[in-house]
């Protein structure tokens, strides 16, 4: 199995973790978080000085023999997915942005990725239930500790009530 953006099996969820651990298939990790669970994987691509796992994956894919730096050899869906992942992990370039992040965005746009369309799909197309959920969470579920930490709990009953979809 390939584990992307998941520095340890425990981050994969209680149902998936035992399956991943018991799998006899080679295990590959591609991640940008600190302290990956290296011993559980046969191959580890780990770099913390990148914006996202998508940025690290972009670097890996560009060096593959069938690509050799030529993004035109990749399907547009792949390029769009890489741009989408990098955009969401950086909160639209608001955090964890490095020079390589901007280079990646530039290369993807030069290869034909329509960043404006991706932004529109990510940030301007909400179902009514999603807006209602956001309002509910802010109004009824937002907790702020005395230290100033804010959090919300989105349990299964709330997910069901608002037809939550990822």
Functional labels for PLM-detected ranges:
Residues 1-13, 50-58, 84-88, 114-127:
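Short charge-dense sequence patches
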Residues 1-43:
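Active-site cofactor/cluster-binding pocket
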Residues 12-15, 39-42, 57, 97-98, ...:
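A short secondary-structure junction signal
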Residues 14-15, 70, 118, 131:
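A generic "cationic amphipathic patch" detector
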Residues 28-33, 55-58, 113-114, 136, ...:
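Short, surface-exposed, polar/charged, turn-prone segments marking secondary-structure boundaries
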Residues 32-106:
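Short alpha-helices
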Residues 83, 88-166:
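Hydrophobic helix-and-loop "lid/oligomerization" segment in the mid-to-C-terminal part
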């Amino acid at each position: 199995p390939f584990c992307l953006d998941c520095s340890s099996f425990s981050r994969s969820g209680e149902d998936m973790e035992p399956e991943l651990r018991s799998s006899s298939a080679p295990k590959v990790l591609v991640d940008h978080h600190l302290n990956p669970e290296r011993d559980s994987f046969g191959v580890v691509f780990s770099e913390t000085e990148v914006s996202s796992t998508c940025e690290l994956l972009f670097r890996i894919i560009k060096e593959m023999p069938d690509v050799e730096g030529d993004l035109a050899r990749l399907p547009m869906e792949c390029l769009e997915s890489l741009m989408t992942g990098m955009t969401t992990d950086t909160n639209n370039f608001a955090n964890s942005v490095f020079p390589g992040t901007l280079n990646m965005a530039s290369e993807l746009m030069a290869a034909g990725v329509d960043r404006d369309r991706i932004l529109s799909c990510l940030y301007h197309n909400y179902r009514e239930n999603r807006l209602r959920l956001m309002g509910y969470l802010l109004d009824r579920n937002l907790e702020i500790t005395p230290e100033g930490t804010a959090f919300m709990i989105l349990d299964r009953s709330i997910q069901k009530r608002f037809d939550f979809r990822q």
